[in-house]
Every structure is written in structure tokens, then in C-alpha cells.
């Protein structure tokens, strides 16, 4: 349950995202996916950011706690971060409208990534202020994805 405007919202909208730090060398991404596969954990959404020395894989997995433990046990540097997922129509301007709602209320997007499936676009957002972000999205009737929905994508 999550509190928005002092009311309990019945679907937990904050999801756990894994951030895995990878050396820039051949095979490291393969190793991550093999560890997850061995544990039966599905990697359903991801993005990779990199610099000269390392990359960061940010991903949504089917079982975050299990994945975290497996990756730690295999000597990966991994963190868990709270994110929120939304679903919007996969048409021009749809995301711009949602981002305008947030920026007008002072919510800064630290990063985001998305994936589309037919007529629907799903967006993972890491805001600077989770409570305010969820409040704004709820008030504007944006379709928030429950964590359990994200883990099944």
C-alpha cells in the first residue's frame, strides 16, 4: 500500500530496479544474463549507460530480491533503486503530456527508459521526489503500473 494525499492507494506503485555496475570488457553483460537465467529470473526491461571505465545496467527483473542475492553471490556490484512505472498510449505527444504534468509540479526526472508493445508504451521513471511524482501522476489520472505488473512484463 502507498500513501497519496493521506489516502492509502491499493496498488504498490514503487518498484525495485537493479543497477548493476559492469566493467567495460567483453562478456560481462553475458555473465549477468547467465546468472539471472540460472536462477530463473527474467530481465524484462533494461537500459545501459556507460562511460570510459564501466557501464551501469539498470533493469526490471521478475524477482528483484532473488536476482540481487544471485548477483552479489557472483561478485557483481549491484544496488536496488526505487522507480515508478507508467503506461501511456504509444502515440506522439503522450509522453510529453505526462512529463509536462511532472515538470509543472517541480518533479525532476533523474533518468527514465521505456519500451513499447503495440499501442501501449511503458515507461520506467526515477524521479527526484517519489512521493510528489506519484501524487501528481495519480491526480492527473496517469496509468501507474503496480510493481507486480512491472515484474511480469
Label for each model-derived stretch:
Residues 4-153:
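A conserved regulatory-domain signal marking ACT and ACT-like small-molecule sensing domains
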Amino acid at each position: 500500500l502507498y500513501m497519496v494525499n493521506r489516502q492509502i492507494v491499493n496498488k504498490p506503485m514503487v518498484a525495485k530496479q537493479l543497477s548493476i555496475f559492469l566493467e567495460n570488457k567483453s562478456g560481462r553483460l553475458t555473465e549477468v544474463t547467465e546468472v539471472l537465467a540460472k536462477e530463473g529470473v527474467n530481465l524484462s526491461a533494461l537500459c545501459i549507460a556507460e562511460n570510459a571505465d564501466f557501464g551501469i545496467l539498470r533493469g526490471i527483473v521478475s524477482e528483484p530480491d532473488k536476482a540481487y542475492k544471485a548477483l552479489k553471490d557472483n561478485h557483481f556490484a549491484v544496488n536496488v533503486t526505487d522507480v515508478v512505472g507508467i503506461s501511456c498510449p504509444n502515440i506522439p505527444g503522450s509522453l510529453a503530456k505526462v512529463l509536462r504534468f511532472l515538470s509543472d509540479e517541480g518533479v525532476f526526472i533523474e533518468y527514465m527508459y521505456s519500451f513499447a508493445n503495440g499501442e501501449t508504451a511503458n515507461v520506467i521513471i526515477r524521479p527526484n521526489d517519489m512521493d510528489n511524482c506519484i501524487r501528481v501522476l495519480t491526480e492527473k489520472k496517469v496509468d501507474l503500473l503496480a510493481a507486480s505488473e512491472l515484474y511480469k512484463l
